A protein has these predicted regions:
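Gly/Ser/Thr/Pro-rich low-complexity, intrinsically disordered segments
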Residues: 2-246
Length: 246
């Protein structure tokens, strides 16, 4: 075989590898040796750090159960806002554009929505209002994404529609020290302004609100697989779940 032919074959194979990495189903992240959720407690926050292989955003009103012996979920909770209490599921009942398992749903949002989160190609990103191209990219790559109220972005507070004096329990998807994806929840009710400052004090650089109130239910697994429940509002009217998989 001529040398030029061999070189051409190598170039074609390399191009195929690059194209697959760019446009194939690439939702898997770096594989970890031990799948669990680590917990860090501060005076007023609970920081949950999933050791995961992949992430997805599921559109369904079926609550993922924590007692399945073959469950590959290590963390799950609601993420986007839900429009109405409905007994049947509809993507149109999820407020804002989202990507579920590589499927893009362009929907109208709310004035509360000021940012987004995407996960594809094994990497995550927090985004401000210019997120549509990244949503489309996540869909092309078999990834996921959702829109929500941005609380912190690149180490700075974001002006929010939610008032700083609103005093309830809060939860957010966060970027710790700009390197570690985590979920942060208050250890009880506190003013929203205090929550923002507490996130900054804990080293959070980016934070996207996660729905709470009547949609606060979720759970996570510790290092030996024991599920721990968070939130109490367990019902059949949920529309979406942020899921970390092992």
């Amino acid at each position: 075989m001529k040398k030029s032919v061999i070189i051409a074959i190598i170039v074609v194979v390399a191009a195929c590898v690059v194209l697959f990495s760019l446009f194939g189903h690439c939702n898997k992240g770096p594989q970890v040796s031990e799948h669990r959720v680590d917990t860090i407690m501060t005076d007023n926050l609970v920081i949950l750090i999933p050791r995961y292989d992949s992430i997805d955003f599921l559109g369904t009103n079926i609550t993922p159960e924590a007692d399945s012996p073959h469950d590959n979920i290590i963390y799950v909770s609601a993420a986007s806002f839900t429009l109405k209490y409905l007994d049947t599921f509809s993507h149109s009942n999820i407020i804002g554009t989202h990507v579920c398992s590589g499927e893009l749903h362009k929907l109208s949002g709310s004035k509360l929505l000021s940012g987004a989160f995407v996960y594809y190609n094994g990497q995550y990103k927090f985004l401000d209002k210019d997120y549509m191209s990244e949503m489309e990219r996540a869909a092309q790559c078999g990834g996921c994404g959702f829109t929500q109220q941005l609380i912190l972005y690149k180490g700075a507070k974001v002006k929010t529609r939610t008032k700083d004096n609103m005093n309830v329990q809060f939860r957010a998807l966060c970027n710790l020290h700009d390197t570690t994806l985590c979920i942060v929840q208050t250890r009880g009710s506190m003013p929203f302004g205090q929550f923002k400052q507490s996130l900054l004090n804990a080293g959070i650089t980016d934070a996207l609100y996660l729905d709470m109130g009547a949609w606060d239910y979720g759970w996570y697994r510790d290092s030996i697989g024991t599920p721990h429940h968070i939130g109490t509002s367990r019902h059949g009217n949920y529309t979406n779940w942020l899921v970390f998989y092992k």
